[in-house]
């Protein structure tokens, strides 16, 4: 009943998830095997999103675009998106163990699947979009484009999940650290980006408190271009985090 022809503006949490280095992985499979691999990847990832009240917008090869808070209202949409991203990495670890065993059984080389995720929250136009002949329920807007850009930043910064400042502010119960202030294509104002590292349990852990305190100093020295101090703080931050990430 809440579906409407055309579009409406709504506050939405958006996710882009993409497989890294998929070209190298695809070379290990024939077309049928590659299709099976994609399906094995998309199925558990989709289930996580749907279990947390997300809507799959579309699949683009090995990429998933999803959003929360439409067509059904989800008051906790920011938290649902963040939790989905974290759980997806747990499911990916399980899938890679299965794929590694399959590769060993078939005497085939194994490359683990690795993904990057971008999350953003903002006002989007959501509704039935397309032509008179065919339309899809989808979202449009600058915040959708930004989310795609955030996913692309995950590899460059060496983190799993990159989120916007808007998402970070709306989800204070999650463990995050600032990554940078970047200029994104198509935007005139620099965008502050963060890495999502964990849930409330991580946020209250001693290792995260220690690491995030050092990391805040690191960001400050980095912005002041005190490179020597920044490098020393990188070592301290890594030591505080240990093998957590």
Give, region by region, the residue ranges found by the protein language model.
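Cytosolic regulatory/linker segments at or just downstream of nucleotide-handling modules
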Residues: 124, 147, 153-220, 236, ...
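Alpha-helical scaffold within the catalytic cores of cyclic-nucleotide enzymes
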Residues: 38-54, 70-117, 142-155, 175
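Helical mechanochemical/support elements of P-loop NTPase systems and associated helical scaffolds
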Residues: 8, 15, 34, 41, ...
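Catalytic strand-loop-helix junctions within cyclic-nucleotide turnover domains
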Residues: 67-77, 117-137, 154-157, 197-200
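Solenoid-repeat scaffolds in large eukaryotic assemblies
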Residues: 227-233, 237
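Regulatory cytosolic signal-relay segments
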Residues: 1-9, 93, 98
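Catalytic NTP-binding/metal-coordinating core of nucleotidyl cyclase/transferase enzymes
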Residues: 3-84, 137
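Short helix-adjacent coil turns
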Residues: 218-229
């Amino acid at each position: 009943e809440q579906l409407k022809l055309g579009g409406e503006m709504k506050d939405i949490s958006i996710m882009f998830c993409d497989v890294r280095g998929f070209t190298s992985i695809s070379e290990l499979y024939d077309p049928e095997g590659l299709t099976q691999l994609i399906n094995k990847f998309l199925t558990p990832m989709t289930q996580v999103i749907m279990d947390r009240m997300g809507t799959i917008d579309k699949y683009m090869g090995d990429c998933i675009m999803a959003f929360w808070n439409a067509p059904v209202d989800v008051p906790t949409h920011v938290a649902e998106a963040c939790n989905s991203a974290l759980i997806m990495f747990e499911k990916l670890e399980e899938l890679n163990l299965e794929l590694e065993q399959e590769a060993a059984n078939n005497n085939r080389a194994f490359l683990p699947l690795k993904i990057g995720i971008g999350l953003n929250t903002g006002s989007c136009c959501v509704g039935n979009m397309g032509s008179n002949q065919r339309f899809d329920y989808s979202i449009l807007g600058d915040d959708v484009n930004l989310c795609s850009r955030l996913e692309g930043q995950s590899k460059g910064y060496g983190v799993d999940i990159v989120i916007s400042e808007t998402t970070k502010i709306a989800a204070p119960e999650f463990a995050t650290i600032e990554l940078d202030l970047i200029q994104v294509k198509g935007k005139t104002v620099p965008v502050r980006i963060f890495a999502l590292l964990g849930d409330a349990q991580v946020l209250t852990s001693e290792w995260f408190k220690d690491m995030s305190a050092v990391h805040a100093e690191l960001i400050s020295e980095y912005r002041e271009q005190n490179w020597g101090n920044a490098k020393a703080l990188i070592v301290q931050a890594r030591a505080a985090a240990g093998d957590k990430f």
